[in-house]
């Protein structure tokens, strides 16, 4: 493989359990011993008391590092990726979470796998993001991005909402439901999958719309081109209606506002070990049957 080598490595990711910080510390000293320039996310350096470390924010790491190693689960990866996607930096994950669809490296074998990656032995792909605008006429939009999905939902559990969906400015359907999931191929194995949506392979230029508990027997997931623009309109809005991006950022929707969702201009430069297989990951994470022969 004739891949780009790395000179400056960023270490990011906030583990749910303090014991997982040991992975960050081992990784830091391992990289330093091999002569790499290392930047550590500020809070991690503080938690580990790495007083001599070069520290920075996610944006600093995105600007100055060649590779970011995200230690944690998919939640950590999503939070970091929304920032790092704005920069020319490659990203790989060490799984210290549960499923780990986006974090490939096994913590017990991460250093060996990472050693190969640092030698240029890796697979590279781009994952697109969704950009969401909550807006009203003649006013500035509130904007956020998502790697996995954008979800329209009420604040109350099991509270039905009514809305219309327009695709490329053409009416597509109206719905009474608990909400709507708009997912990327990356997000098709997350919340969308739990709601009955299809799995989209990461190379597809597609977006899937998945109804949440629709008040009809005929509503089905809809797959559209990633170049399409989705517009959500409301006849009236309850006080707690929200748009959620990756279940981490919430944008309230107020009376007179509409929601616009489209493919972002940014993308995540995700890399994997050289033996990575998307379908093997699906089989392992979802417990699919083994090969018969």
Curated annotation (Swiss-Prot):
Its EC number is 2.7.1.23. Pfam families: NAD_kinase, NAD_kinase_C. Belongs to the NAD kinase family. It is found in: Cytoplasm. Homodimer. Involved in the regulation of the intracellular balance of NAD and NADP, and is a key enzyme in the biosynthesis of NADP. Catalyzes specifically the phosphorylation on 2'-hydroxyl of the adenosine moiety of NAD to yield NADP. This is NAD kinase. The gene is nadK. The active site is at residue 74. InterPro entries: ATP-NAD_kinase_N, ATP-NAD_kinase_PpnK-typ_C, NAD/diacylglycerol_kinase_sf, NADK.
